[in-house]
Amino acid sequence: MPAENAHIRNFCIIAHIDHGKSTLADRLLDKTGTLTKREAQAQFLDNMAIERERGITIKAQSVRMNYTAKDGKQYVLNLIDTPGHVDFAYEVSRSLAACEGALLVVDATQGVEAQTLSNVYMALDHNLEIIPVINKIDLPSADVDRTRAEIEDVIGIDASVAVPCSAKEGIGIQDILESVVQNVPPPSGSADAPLKALIFDSWYDNYRGVVTLVRVLEGTLKLKQKIKLFSNNKVFEVQELGVFSPFSRPVPQLIAGEVGVLVANVKELQDAKVGDTVTEESRPTAEPFPGFQEVKPMVFSGIFPVDSADYENLRDALAKLVLNDSAFTYEPESSTALGFGFRCGYLGLLHMEIVQERLEREYNLNLITTAPSVVYRITTSKGETLLVDNPAKLPPVQHIEKFEEPILTCHIHVPNDHLGAILKLCQERRGVQKDMKYLGSSGQRVQVTYEMPLAEVVFDFFDKLKSVSRGYASLDYELAGYIESDLARLDILINGDPVDALSVIVHRERAYLRGREVCQKLKEVIPKQMYEVAIQAAIGAKIISRETISAIRKNVLAKCYGGDISRKRKLLEKQKEGKKRMKQVGTVEIPQEAFLAVLKSEQ
C-alpha cells in the first residue's frame, strides 16, 4: 500500500429511499467542519443538485472531508453520494466502483427493504467493506435489536459492529466516522503507474462544457495533460481539476486514490459517458476499468406539444435536456391525430416522469404524452428480427411469426399482513411466482420473487403496490430477458378511421376489457356531432367493442299535430338522408381532453 494514500478513505452511503441517507450525509459534513454554520442547510447534497438544475442521472455527489481521528492522525474522507432509485442501478454500480467501503443505512423502525438488499449485493460484488448503520434510534417505534438480527439473517453480514445512530438528533455520528477510518481499507494503486481513472458521473455546464467526476485508480492526473477516453479513443487536454469540499475548489493534481472534478474541453455529454476509463495519451494503461455499459432506454412514449406552434421550443428543450442526461433519447415522430412531436426513451418510469416534469416546469411547455410502451421483439415470417417501441411501426398481423415482450424479475419485500393483497396484485399483472421466503427469525417480513412483463409494471404497478400494502412493500427489479406472449395491437377507430395516437399493444386476454374501457371514455368526452359517430376498438380487421354517439337532431315532427304516419315517416327519412350525406363529408374533431382522458384511464 503506497504511503501517499494511506490516509484516504473513499466510501458511499447506501440505503432504501427515506431511510435517512441525505440527513446522515449532512451530519457527517457538520461533524467534520466541512460546512460552516452559514452554509449548513437541510439535505445539502440534494439541494446542490437542484440549485445547479442538474438532471436526474447526475445525482452522484462527492464531498471531501478532513477528519482528525482519535489516534491523532489527519484523514481525508471522500463521501460519494449515490442515487437510491432502481431506475438508476447502473449509476449506483459506477459510484460503488469508485469506493472501498460503504455505510449501509437501515431504518430501525422499518428494517431491511428491497432496494437496500439490491444495493448491498451490488456493493458485495465490488468487494466493498460494509459498515451497517442503524438509523432513527430516537423514534419510539425503533427496535435496534430486531434490526440487527434482520441485517444478520437477511443480508448475512456481521451486525455486531453495527453503529446505532440518529442522524436527525446527531447521535452516534462520531462513532460512524471512527468506524470508517478503522474498517474501510485505504485505496491501493500507485501514483507512478500509468494513469487510469473512472468517470462515475458527468453533467453539462454552459460555460465549461462537460464536467466529470472521476476516481483516480492509478497514476496521477495533472493540468494540461493530454488524456484519452477508452470507449471512443478521443483525446482531450485537462483544463481544470478540483475537489468538492463541499464547493468546488481547484487543485493542481489528483493522485491515485483521490476523487475529484475533471474538466477537459469535452463538448458533448455523449463523449464522456459514466463508467468510461480515462488514461494518458502518451502512456496509456493496459486495461480499462471493467463493466462499462451503454445505458439503453427501457420505456418509450411520444411527447407532443398541445399547441403546434411550440414544436420548435420543444425541440430546443429536448436538445438541452440531452446535454444533461445521457440515458435519455429522442427522435422526431409525426401523428395524424396529434401533429408533430418526438418519440422519447427513458430508463424507467421515474425517469420518464422527471423528464416530463422538467420540460413543463423549466421550459413552460404544455405537453401531451402518449401511453408508455416497451420494446417488443418480433420475428417476421421471413425470419427477420425487429425491435418495435411504437405500436404504429408494428408489421401486419399476418407477417408476424413470433411476438416477444421483455420480462422482469421483481423482488418484493412486504410485511406478512399484506402478503395476500400483493400476491393478488401480481397475479392480475400476469406475474409468475418464482420464490417466497420469510426473512429473519420473527418471520414478520416476506420476500416474494415474481417474473412479470415489463409492460405490466410500466403503468402504475409501483403506485398500486404501495397502496395495497399501505406503503410498506418495497420493490426491486432487473431485466430478465424476453418471453413469447400472445400480444396484439389494439386500434381505436372513429367513424372507421384509425387514430394512431390511441393504438396500444396489449395481451389478447385483456384486449376486450381495454377496448371497451377506451370506447366508453371517448364516448363521454367527444362532443356530439350533427351526425352519428361510431367509436370502435379493433384487433386487425375484427371489431371487439363499439360505442355510438347519437347525432344532434332537430325535431322535424314538431309541426305535425296528429296527421298521417306516412307524412311523419317522409320527414324522418328526409332528415336521415341529410345526416348520411353530412357523414360522408364530415370529419370528427377529437378534442385534446379526449386524449388526456384516455391516457388517464389507461394508467
Curated annotation (Swiss-Prot):
The keyword Cell inner membrane applies. Pfam families: EFG_C, GTP_EFTU, GTP_EFTU_D2, LepA_C. Its main location: membrane. Transmembrane segments: none annotated. It catalyses: GTP + H2O = GDP + phosphate + H(+). Keywords: Cell inner membrane, Cell membrane, GTP-binding, Hydrolase, Membrane, Nucleotide-binding, Protein biosynthesis. InterPro entries: EF-4, EFG_III/V, EFG_V-like, EFTu-like_2, G_TR_CS, LepA_C_sf, LepA_CTD, LepA_IV. One of its GO terms (cellular component) is plasma membrane. Belongs to the TRAFAC class translation factor GTPase superfamily. Classic translation factor GTPase family. LepA subfamily. This is Elongation factor 4. It comes from Myxococcus xanthus (strain DK1622).
